[in-house]
């Protein structure tokens, strides 16, 4: 006996269902509850056990060990935090920087209410939302690029 039950094509009922395009899943075991309750957890636990075993038996280092005596001149965050880092760096008052970062999501939440009279779903026919999106994208790219420059050239990107 094999693992997969082969269909009995001599059965007239099955042949009639197959002729109508039905019955392709008529034979065999159902996925619920057999596979979902029993086989899937076994596979998931086996994969997690394999990953844990490999991590214990052959741990790989993630980068170089830290050297407290070799600190860079300016410590930069990860690339996706550059715009917020730049906002906090250029504003003289830190509370003003935090309030500015909190105002960004609040302003974004107001856009649907401002443009509620516009019934179009096409973004090119919604000028306020499109303008806010393009301005926000340009500002985030500008601030992100400026975070890599020294503080005196960060707003102009060294261009002016």
UniProtKB/Swiss-Prot annotation:
Localization terms from the record: Cellular thylakoid membrane
Assembly and binders: The 4 large subunits of the cytochrome b6-f complex are cytochrome b6, subunit IV (17 kDa polypeptide, PetD), cytochrome f and the Rieske protein, while the 4 small subunits are PetG, PetL, PetM and PetN. The complex functions as a dimer.
Pfam families attached to this UniProt entry: Cytochrom_B_C (PF00032)
MF term (GO), any: electron transporter, transferring electrons within cytochrome b6/f complex of photosystem II activity
PROSITE patterns assigned to the protein according to its UniProt record, in alphabetical order: CYTB_CTER
Name of the protein described by the UniProt record: Cytochrome b6-f complex subunit 4
Bilayer topology term: Multi-pass membrane protein
SUPFAM superfamilies: a domain/subunit of cytochrome bc1 complex (Ubiquinol-cytochrome c reductase)
Described purpose of this protein according to its UniProt entry: Component of the cytochrome b6-f complex, which mediates electron transfer between photosystem II (PSII) and photosystem I (PSI), cyclic electron flow around PSI, and state transitions.
Database matches in InterPro entries: Cyt_b/b6_C (IPR005798), Cyt_b/b6_C_sf (IPR036150), Cyt_b6/f_cplx_suIV (IPR005870), Cytochrome_b_C_euk/bac (IPR048260)
